Amino acid sequence: MVPPVTSDRSESARLAGKRVVVTGGARGIGGEIAARFAAEGARVSILDRLVDLGREHASATGGSFHEVDLLDPVATASTTQAAVDSMGGVDILVNSAGILRFTSLLDLTVQDWNETFSINTRAMLTTMQVSVRAMIAAGHGGKIINLASMAAKKGGAGEGAYPPSKAAVVALTRMAALEWGCHGITANSLCPGYILTEMGAATRTQADIDTWSSYSPLGRLGQSSDVAAVALFLASPDSDYLTGQAINVTGGMVMH
């Protein structure tokens, strides 16, 4: 559960007054990012299909929740627009929503391929288009942070359409950086490694956790807070000259 955010925000909060849209912000990495940004003074709108969790986290972060089915491109566009309009604009977009369906390439179906790309990549394009139009109209620039995966760089046997969909996220983010940089908009992707979210902790054995931890020179799995900390840097003015990058958050499992 994402902890409640205190209302005692200092003037030095790194994201004071910033308006943020977070897809997949009901739990996991997206939920942690939403909470971290809110704690730094941002106003956060969470987009997710998980209504109860989404409302709970929105209440905890002092933000708003918008139910969305990212498989539906029309609903994705209209819901993103509603979130932007509810805040009077958007300064930061975080695309964290994604799905992973385990299957071999030989057993991968067209439906699984299409649905994975629809949620992991196509919906990301839609939320960016809506948000960037608002950013350009406002004339103040903006920040785009897209969640990819280390699977985008190293693949993943048995992970179906997930690795290629995340590789597409990296390429899409670089295109965004190239096309929208002239408007003062930066775009970067994060490539997390093995992150122990609440859902992952409930479904993995200790043996799994120990094995995956051994892949990192640091000897542990990542936490959602590890990814949120890097996302906060990308959302802050400290990263204003950083764009088009695919940043590993893998504890050294991937070193390029």
Model-based region annotation:
Residues A13-V44:
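Canonical Rossmann dinucleotide-binding motif of NAD(H)/NADP(H)-dependent dehydrogenases/reductases
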Residues G181, T186, L242-G244:
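Short, small/polar-rich loop/turn modules that mediate ligand/substrate recognition or access, typified
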Residues S104-L105, D112-N114, G200, W212:
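Substrate-binding pocket helix/loop in short-chain dehydrogenase/reductase
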Residues R133, L178-E179, D240:
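Alpha-helical segment proximal to the catalytic Tyr-Lys
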Residues M128, S165, T173:
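Active-site helix of classical SDR
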Residues V2-S12, K154, L232, T243-H256:
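Short C-terminal tail/terminal secondary-structure segment
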Residues S149:
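Residue(s) in the substrate-gating loop at a strand-loop-helix junction
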